[in-house]
Amino acid sequence: MMTRYLVLSLLLSAIMGASVRGSEADFLSDLAANVVKVGLDLDGSGAVPTESTPDDVCTGVSFSRNLKYGENDLNVLDVATGDSKKTASHPVLMVVEGKSFAGEDGVPDTAGQLRDQAICFAARNGMVGVKVTYRLAPANPWPAGAKDVAAAISWVHDNIDLFGGRSDEVVLVGYSAGAFHVASYLAHPELREPDPGVAGVVLVSGIYSPDADANAAEKSYFGNDASKYKDRSAFPGIVNVEAPIVLAWASLDSPGLVAQGEKLKAQLCNAGHCPRTIVLSGSDSLSSALTLDAANKGLAAPIEELVRELESRGLP
């Protein structure tokens, strides 16, 4: 136990410029307070937050796991940092990825678990990666997902500097169901702070306006009353987003998903805010989309270009 606290003490001292003084009891008390602030102690187990992964794509990347940003067991996030963490502050790639709105008793299906590759891409390319899990229907219906995005954004703004990240350069990425939660967060100002707190947005293969053909998982989140779907959609509020947007869907997406993406693009363009649009070549996950294919039609290059633009313009 003492070794664990010493490791965390050195980490916090290096980052925050703190010095350790006083009795051991005072030291442990002060450290515990800081641990709670940054969410490093999720459940009282005291697990050391950083670890490495053997995957080639994550070589040289360190993780801080299961950092709590809300009260629910699913309100956790992971942070990935690279070797350059200590040399400068970095843009943040914040990923909300989920293949469904629902899970049995609010527990996510393992097939829909977040993947590390997306945030490893961030950490290995001069960014800090953050991936977010959120509450699921039927236990947590609309607008729980958008509220969770708001809470996670708040956590990042309060704490990401401890990991070498810049809170004023957050690029918010939503994939699949996560894309709706991100779009809903941006489109409904009543669910967030007046300033959405993001410098750029990436939306991938999402639905943005539920309709009467909603499947069972979607109905468990949006409700069975289709007359309420219009008010719960991302339209028209999403067109008021001022941050630059990258919009993507896959060539193998269902016609319904493609139509959703095309509708969002049309509405944004009509509002004078055309997104950069990419059609991915058969990508079935955000992590695979971040690996460039032979035709360079993945998301890696557009995201890196967006980040460079934000840094050069000093946004927000």
Question: Can you name each region flagged by the protein language model?
Answer:
Residues 248, 255-265, 269-316:
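C-terminal catalytic histidine-bearing segment of alpha/beta-hydrolase fold enzymes
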Residues 151-217, 229:
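Primarily recognizes the serine-hydrolase "nucleophile elbow" in alpha/beta-hydrolase
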Residues 56-59, 199, 206-237, 243:
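Mobile cap/lid helix-loop segments that gate and shape the active-site cleft of serine hydrolases
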Residues 85-89, 93-121:
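Short, surface-exposed "cap/lid" segments of acyl-processing enzymes
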Residues 96, 204, 280-283:
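Alpha/beta-hydrolase
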Residues 27-88:
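N-terminal cap/lid segment of alpha/beta-hydrolase-fold proteins
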Residues 109-114, 118-119, 130-167, 293-294:
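Catalytic nucleophile-loop/oxyanion-hole region of alpha/beta-hydrolase
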Residues 241, 247-249:
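Short beta-strand/loop motif that positions the catalytic acidic residue
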